[in-house]
């Protein structure tokens, strides 16, 4: 079974992913793969430079994430262009990793995909687990975690699909507004149910 783990920005998805790994469930991290596919020498980086210009590279030839972020956040068309380059490369890597885990005998593999809904990747998973927090908590965590201004944080939240729409399509909802222990209990219960499916 492939479980799609997702959640809004700063919802606590990483907390859940770490807990799942500690339970012996392999987690394939889309964000980690997204960083790997844009390393120097990778085809996706060459496409990004061709699309957005040399100024998105640092002096050492690596991607200047801050520069690229400034270009795409708040510009729907440019963000779409970037996604059309990076997402296919990430999907291919995720599938390859999940296949390897299943070949090794794992019956459950988690695909940690922040933009599962936005990229319509339901076909890659059997179940969708959504980690969520209320908007005020999300905003506070994002400002604290990434050192953003309130305006920048609100822009990043607005760039994602609304939580209410995501909840309607999720198989498992994980409320991360409370304590870590409460979140862990919800994940443990959800795992117990999947053991019989």
Curated annotation (Swiss-Prot):
What is this enzyme's EC? 2.7.1.24
Catalysed reaction, written as an equation: 3'-dephospho-CoA + ATP = ADP + CoA + H(+)
Full protein name? Dephospho-CoA kinase
Task: Please give the family membership noted in the entry.
Answer: Belongs to the CoaE family.
Per UniProt, subcellular location reads as: Cytoplasm
Keywords attached to this Swiss-Prot or TrEMBL record, sorted alphabetically, are:
ATP-binding, Coenzyme A biosynthesis, Cytoplasm, Kinase, Nucleotide-binding, Transferase
Under the heading CDD domains, the entry gives: DPCK
Q: Name one GO molecular function term.
A: ATP binding
Taxonomically, the superkingdom here is: Bacteria
Q: Which residues form a coiled coil?
A: none
Cross-referenced InterPro entries: Depp_CoAkinase, P-loop_NTPase
GO biological-process terms attached to the record: coenzyme A biosynthetic process
Start and end residues of each DPCK domain? 2-197
Among NCBIfam families, the record links this protein to: dephospho-CoA kinase
Predominant location category: cytoplasm
Q: Copy the pathway line from the protein's UniProt record.
A: Cofactor biosynthesis; coenzyme A biosynthesis; CoA from (R)-pantothenate: step 5/5
Q: Which GO terms describe its cellular component?
A: cytoplasm
Which annotated residues bind ATP? 10-15
Q: What does it do?
A: Catalyzes the phosphorylation of the 3'-hydroxyl group of dephosphocoenzyme A to form coenzyme A.
């Amino acid at each position: 079974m492939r479980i799609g783990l997702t959640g809004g920005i700063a919802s606590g998805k990483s907390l859940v992913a770490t807990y799942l790994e500690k339970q012996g469930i392999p987690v394939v991290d889309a964000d980690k793969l997204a960083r790997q596919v844009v390393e120097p020498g990778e085809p996706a980086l060459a496409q990004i430079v061709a699309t957005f210009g040399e100024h998105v590279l640092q002096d050492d030839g690596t991607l200047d994430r801050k520069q690229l972020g400034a270009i795409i956040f708040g510009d729907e068309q440019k963000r779409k262009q970037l996604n059309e380059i990076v997402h296919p490369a990430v999907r291919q890597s995720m599938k390859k990793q999940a296949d390897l885990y299943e070949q090794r005998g794992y019956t459950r593999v988690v695909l940690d995909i922040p933009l599962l809904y936005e990229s319509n990747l339901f076909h890659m998973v059997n179940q969708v687990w959504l980690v969520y927090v209320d908007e005020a908590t999300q905003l506070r965590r994002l400002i604290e975690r990434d050192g953003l201004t309130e305006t920048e944080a609100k822009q990043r939240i607005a760039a994602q699909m609304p939580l209410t729409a995501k909840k309607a399509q999720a198989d498992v909802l994980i409320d991360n507004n409370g304590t870590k222990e409460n979140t862990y209990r919800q994940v443990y219960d959800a795992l117990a149910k999947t053991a019989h499916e």
